[in-house]
Amino acid sequence: SDGGVLDASMDYLRYRYEEDQYLNSQDTLFGDMDGGIHLYSGQANLVWPFSKSFTFHAGAKTSFVSIDNNADYNRLQGDSWQPDHDLSCDFQYDENINAGYIQLDAKFSSVSLEAGLRLENTRIEGEQSGNAYQRDSSFTNHYTHLFPTLSVQYALRNGNSLSLTYGKRIVRPNYRDLNPFVYIHDEYTYDKGNTLLRPELSDNLELAYIHGDLFRVGLAFNYTKDVIIKSYLDQGNYVVYVSPENLSSRVSVGPRLSTSQLPLTSFWNVNVSASLIYNRYRLPENYQVKVNKRWTPNIGISNQFSFARTWSAELIGFYNGKMAAGQATIYPLWQINAGIQKKIWKGRGT
């Protein structure tokens, strides 16, 4: 067999930001926020084809993230600025993720198989410094998960195939959602992070029929635990806090259809993406509504037209039906775009 390939890489990212907020209403408020992110990562991957039918993959990755953010709010009282201790704080966050994976690819006359397993360990430590009016708060979170994947493709006649895929995935909270700082949109709406957020864990299964390069039709199922959504909390003082939190679970199931450059005529190609998805959210016990569920149709169509040698046009549109999204219901949304193109200067310009 051919020799294997080993590659390794290291990365460093530094991000710095500063932001001032000035809110002029019945109470004048000024906020000074700054912070920085340092990210270090390294990874190594091995690909080893040890026969004509089998290829082995393995790899490891580690990353370290350090975040230090500071928010300093002052409120105008009379002729002087006074610190607002309810909104001001300092937040430090450290995260270490270590992961390793193995995967085996097998190819036979009519069957292709990919099976893998990834192990991830995450360690998080955070601290929100207090002041004379707020206590210091610190938190830690350690968790380890296994993520299996499986993909089986069976080749039929005439270039068509059947595909079965399964994968367990993780979606971690973004760093802004974990940041406990208060961001003031206006005097009635505050945005605040949540240091207690847990990652989303999902199981994804799809059975599909693939007709050459023209279209794909399938049935997909998804179960997600600890779904992260934006919640809206009324504090009773005419202020609504928008904050991310974990829901109990979400189930999504439904058929999907997609085409790729389907030729309707000699001058007209179309791409279609359509689905009918059932979403069901189970909400925490403290919500008045315990379940939010709905069937949602979605369709997107892209048409490409060619006229003679130098003229072409495009017509694109989509429609997303009424959808359940956490504790909210999103009303239908649609859009249509059109464009026309003319080649000039013997094709060197448009």
Question: Across the structure, where does each feature detected by a protein language model lie?
Answer:
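Face-selective signature of the C-terminal outer-membrane beta-barrel domain
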Residues: 1-127, 155, 215-219, 251-277, ...
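Surface-exposed extracellular loop regions of Gram-negative outer-membrane beta-barrel proteins
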Residues: 16-18, 68, 77-80, 123-130, ...
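Extracellular loop and loop/strand-boundary signature of outer-membrane beta-barrel proteins
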Residues: 25-32, 82-90, 132-139, 186-195, ...
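Residues that define the transmembrane beta-barrel architecture of outer-membrane proteins
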Residues: 36-40, 94-98, 142-146, 201-205, ...
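Outer-membrane beta-barrel signature, preferentially recognizing the C-terminal barrel domain
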Residues: 88-97, 141, 170-218, 223, ...
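Conserved C-terminal beta-signal and adjacent last beta-strands/turns
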Residues: 150, 292-350
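Gram-negative outer-membrane beta-barrel transporters
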Residues: 221-222, 246-320
